[in-house]
């Protein structure tokens, strides 16, 4: 009876001329039916790739998965005892890594949440992973919000993870089949998922620019890290998706070279040759703890030359 009611509700919503315009969930249901040709009563289980194919996909994201692993372990430590599983997918919704308790593994396998399973909307209709990827935002798909009737026993909470190029890289999912999982509990877990996804994004960004100075910028953006990678010449060489949006930079791909001081609106960066030279001399003196001879050696110039530059630049000994 519940199955029939769900199918009828989905079909009615899909056929409504206005529902999709007023509800993101209804819009996803319509995509599932009209764009992907799904029938909500379809009972087939999600398809899974073989181990060899999965390894090929994992190799493409090997460095990212290695960076993400500690955060996945930490998240599972927080939610695993409550019957939840933690899943990491690529940008196409393919499950590449998961954390589930031994006692829950069979249940998640039965739901089709195994390594190599395709949980894109094209494969599974409206669901946490696929809809998160399709809309590139945090989503919660609770039980009968799923498109397929076979998935209405689950609650899925997801957040996207964006790469250093600003493009979608992966999705982080926590799923549960507990019948007593409430909306309040979902909000709590959803906040944990979002925080973990943001931490993974920041960790991978830092790992992608090991020789750069990472600037954490102030922003009201709560959906992603706002980080800039700045090289030794004060040029921005990398920016997270949140930083790209905050500072009006290129949304994806390579960045046009810009001084960080221009973007951050600071007047104390090395703007102009004289200012850059003055900053370099002051840094050298600071490193030498005020010893002019040592500072001169660090700059590769003579002591007398450094004195002349200090006088010209208005730097007291």
Locate the predicted segments by residue.
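Intrinsically disordered, low-complexity terminal regulatory regions
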Residues: 1-123, 127-148, 153-154, 162-165, ...
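PAS/PAS-like sensory domain cap-loop motif
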Residues: 104, 108, 247-254
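Bacterial C-terminal helix-turn-helix
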Residues: 273-317
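C-terminal structured domains
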Residues: 257-258
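Short, Lys/Arg-enriched anionic-surface-contact patches
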Residues: 262-276
């Amino acid at each position: 009876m519940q199955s029939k009611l769900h199918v009828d509700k989905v079909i009615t919503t899909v056929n409504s001329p206005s529902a999709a315009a007023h509800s993101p969930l209804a819009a996803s249901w319509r995509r599932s039916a009209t764009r992907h040709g799904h029938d909500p009563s379809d009972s087939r289980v999600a398809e899974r790739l073989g181990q060899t194919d999965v390894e090929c996909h994992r190799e493409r994201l090997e460095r990212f998965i290695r960076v993400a692993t500690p955060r996945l372990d930490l998240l599972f430590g927080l939610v695993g005892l409550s019957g939840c599983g933690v899943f990491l997918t690529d940008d196409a919704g393919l499950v590449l890594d998961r954390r589930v308790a031994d006692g829950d593994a069979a249940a998640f396998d039965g739901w089709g949440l195994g390594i190599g399973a395709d949980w894109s909307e094209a494969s599974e209709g409206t669901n946490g992973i696929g809809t998160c990827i399709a809309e590139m935002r945090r989503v919660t798909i609770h039980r009968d919000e799923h498109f397929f009737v076979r998935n209405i026993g689950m609650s899925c909470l997801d957040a996207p993870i964006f790469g250093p190029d600003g493009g979608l890289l992966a999705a982080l999912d926590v799923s549960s089949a507990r019948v007593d999982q409430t909306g309040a509990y979902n909000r709590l877990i959803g906040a944990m998922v979002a925080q973990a996804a943001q931490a993974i994004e920041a960790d991978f960004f830092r790992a992608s620019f090991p020789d750069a100075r990472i600037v954490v910028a102030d922003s009201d953006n709560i959906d992603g890290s706002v980080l800039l990678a700045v090289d030794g010449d004060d040029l921005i060489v990398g920016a997270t998706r949140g930083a790209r949006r905050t500072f009006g930079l290129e949304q994806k791909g390579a960045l046009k070279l810009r001084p960080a001081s221009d973007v951050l609106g600071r007047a104390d960066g090395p703007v102009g040759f004289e200012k850059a030279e003055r900053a370099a001399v002051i840094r050298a003196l600071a490193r030498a703890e005020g010893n002019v001879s040592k500072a001169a050696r660090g700059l590769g110039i003579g002591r007398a030359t450094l004195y002349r530059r200090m006088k010209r630049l208005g730097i007291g000994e």
